[in-house]
């Protein structure tokens, strides 16, 4: 009996030790750090920087395209590069969800270019989800935006399904209460939501996203002269759905606080833009960022850091794709 008791105790101890080692291993795999690639791919940041600089110079809309792509990847189910995966005969991927069909190709292209360069320098080492996170940060800096640290060590998802994102991304016509609920469900405050909305200070929107509101004689919040200009710019949009207008008509290629200065003047492009100023829960932050660019930059940087950590995969929960557009 004594021997059986000792054997039982020894078995329990060994089991606990195994569980402890597994927990430690998982914790080590799950840890994100800013210097994650310092030994495995020491030129990681230099390669990213060179790639995005060349792309931004040749195509100035790249920063806005990559920023939108990053949000559409992270916000629904986490920063796992699932939006980069192409559809197959057996699966409709996220990028082919109706809400993602208008994502500009330059955002995808800059990530693919960076991945190609990194695979030559450090094969099977850097995840696509880390590439897009750093590329977006560096692209924003090139157009005047704030610098912020990015923790690294993400893995890429092994799945990408259109059905998993359809109702999880904000729409241009969405009411503020619905927007607040969406952001809140992912742990973002009202102020963080407004700060992230400042991403509209660069980029463009297709006419179909706002033309139903363009009428110089109605009270949709547009400056009348702006409404006339929009109506003219989008006059042929039914025949050419690719026609678009800059989100910030004053400084469209510069990351600044002009977006927030425009909204009170009736120069916000989307219904959700107007809603930020008309709703008492969000208006104080619009006014704050309109008069204080430094505060906007600080809050935007913090919100982007938080977004970059949303739902990340680490260790054995994900993979490092050989190609960003295809699961291994």
UniProtKB/Swiss-Prot annotation:
Parts forming coiled coils: none
Entry-linked PROSITE patterns: PEROXIDASE_1, PEROXIDASE_2, PEROXIDASE_4
Name of this chain's protein: Peroxidase 63
Gene symbol of the encoding locus: PER63
Signal sequence residues: 1-27
Compartment list: Secreted
Cofactor(s) it depends on: heme b; Ca(2+)
Annotated site, Transition state stabilizer, chain positions: 68
Catalytic activity entry: 2 a phenolic donor + H2O2 = 2 a phenolic radical donor + 2 H2O
């Amino acid at each position: 009996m004594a021997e059986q008791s000792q054997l039982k105790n020894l078995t329990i101890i060994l089991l606990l030790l195994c569980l402890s080692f597994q927990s430690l291993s998982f914790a080590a795999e799950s840890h994100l750090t800013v210097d994650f690639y310092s030994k495995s791919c020491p030129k990681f940041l230099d390669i990213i920087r060179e790639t995005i600089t060349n792309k931004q110079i040749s195509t100035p809309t790249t920063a806005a395209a990559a920023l939108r792509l990053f949000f559409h990847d992270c916000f629904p189910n986490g920063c796992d590069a699932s939006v980069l995966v192409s559809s197959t005969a057996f699966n409709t991927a996220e990028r082919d969800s109706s809400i993602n069909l208008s994502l500009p190709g330059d955002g995808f292209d800059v990530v693919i270019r960076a991945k190609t360069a990194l695979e030559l320098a450090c094969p099977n080492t850097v995840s696509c989800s880390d590439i897009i996170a750093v590329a977006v940060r560096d692209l924003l800096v090139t157009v005047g935006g704030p610098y912020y640290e990015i923790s690294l060590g993400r893995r890429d998802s092994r799945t990408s399904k259109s059905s998993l994102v359809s109702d999880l991304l904000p729409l241009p016509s969405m009411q503020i209460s619905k927007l607040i609920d969406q952001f809140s469900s992912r742990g973002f405050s009202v102020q963080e939501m407004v700060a992230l909305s400042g991403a509209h200070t660069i980029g463009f929107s297709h006419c179909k996203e706002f033309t139903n509101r363009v009428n110089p004689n109605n009270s949709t919040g547009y400056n009348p002269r702006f409404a006339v200009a929009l109506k003219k710019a989008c006059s042929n949009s039914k025949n050419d759905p690719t026609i678009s207008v800059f989100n910030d008509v004053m400084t469209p290629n510069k990351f600044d606080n002009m977006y927030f200065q425009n909204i009170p003047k009736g120069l916000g492009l989307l219904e959700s833009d107007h809603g930020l100023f008309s709703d008492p829960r969000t208006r104080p932050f619009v006014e704050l960022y309109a008069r204080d660019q430094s505060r906007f930059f600080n809050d935007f940087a913090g919100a982007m850091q938080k977004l970059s950590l949303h739902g990340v995969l680490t260790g054995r929960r994900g993979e490092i794709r050989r190609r960003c557009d295809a699961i291994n």
